[in-house]
Amino acid sequence: MKTSIFAAGFCVLASVATAETPVLTVYTYDSFVSDWGPGPAVEKAFEATCGCDLQFVGAGDGAALLARIRLEGARTKADVVLGLDTNLTATAAETGLFAPSGIRANYDLPVAWEDTTFVPYDWGYFAFVYDKTKLATPPKGFKALAASDLKIVIQDPRSSTPGLGLLLWVKDAYGDEAPMIWEDLSDNIVTVTKGWSEAYGMFLEGEADMVLSYTTSPAYHLIAEQDDTKAAAPFAEGHYMQIEVAAKLAGTGQPELADKFLQFMVSDGFQSIIPTTNWMYPAITPADGLPDGFETLITPAKSLLVPAGQADALRDAALAEWLTALSK
């Protein structure tokens, strides 16, 4: 009997302790919460300071995050969304589901940052990655790629931020000629995946000659695997920039904790994790600088970026052109 009473009392105390620990729910993309992504290290570092339970929820790829939040609306369990980018922020703001954070920081971004709702945490350039042992002379642009017999894997712009980035990359570089570029590229495309992880996995398994990824992707192979055979192909048209962001939900039940997390994201404790887990440039250079190996990455001679306020309208037109070209 005493054992039963003791056990019951212990369970009550455990329940009270659990109830007193605030939970912060963060929706993000799948690769962020993978064992090799930033999620585990970020969770450990933040929980050491917040007295809370940080729970990441993988919700597909970046563009799928916004779709899920819009579907859930005010009923969403998310306190913070991490993994949108500037191609989606205007659309996200129009939903009315996100609240200003007021976070300010001295960012090391290639562009000025004035948005007080969305907090940037990393950035990079899209690129086609290839294996130098299999492809000695990579194409130097979209037209050269389309004229080749190389096979590529790309991501769906409706669910993936890299896929959307490619869409706007082609549109920004070629304007009215974009439909022709897509028609010419259609024979090169092996498949269109829902997200980045699937596409990159296919490339590593030898199912394509090149994959849409980032100029920083070869750093993973160089630093984590001591493999210098992967490289990003410089394109004459320039490379499209991605700035990834996070924001708190207006309906969060943990507004102060959400703000604390966003503030943590611009601290060295978070930013120092990004280069060798998310394999992107951090929004703020860590105190110890970038890891050795990042200096070997290509630097685009020209960078492209559609302003957030214009990406909305341009995206719809570019998506229609893309769908038409790939359906032929």
Summary of predicted features, one role per range:
Residues 98-105, 116-120, 143, 222-240, ...:
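Short beta-strand->loop
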Residues 127-134, 171, 242-255, 273-276:
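A bilobed periplasmic-binding-protein/Venus flytrap-type ligand-binding module shared by bacterial periplasmic
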Residues 291-328:
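Extracellular/periplasmic bilobal clamshell ligand-binding domains
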Residues 87-91, 204, 208-229, 278:
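A ligand-binding cleft/hinge motif common to bilobed small-molecule-binding domains
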Residues 249-305:
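Mature extracytoplasmic/periplasmic domains
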Residues 40-56:
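Short alpha-helix C-terminal cap/hinge motif
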Residues 111, 124, 182-186, 192-193, ...:
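Periplasmic-binding protein-like
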Residues 23, 27-39, 60-64, 76-208:
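Extracytoplasmic ligand-binding site segments that recognize negatively charged/polar headgroups
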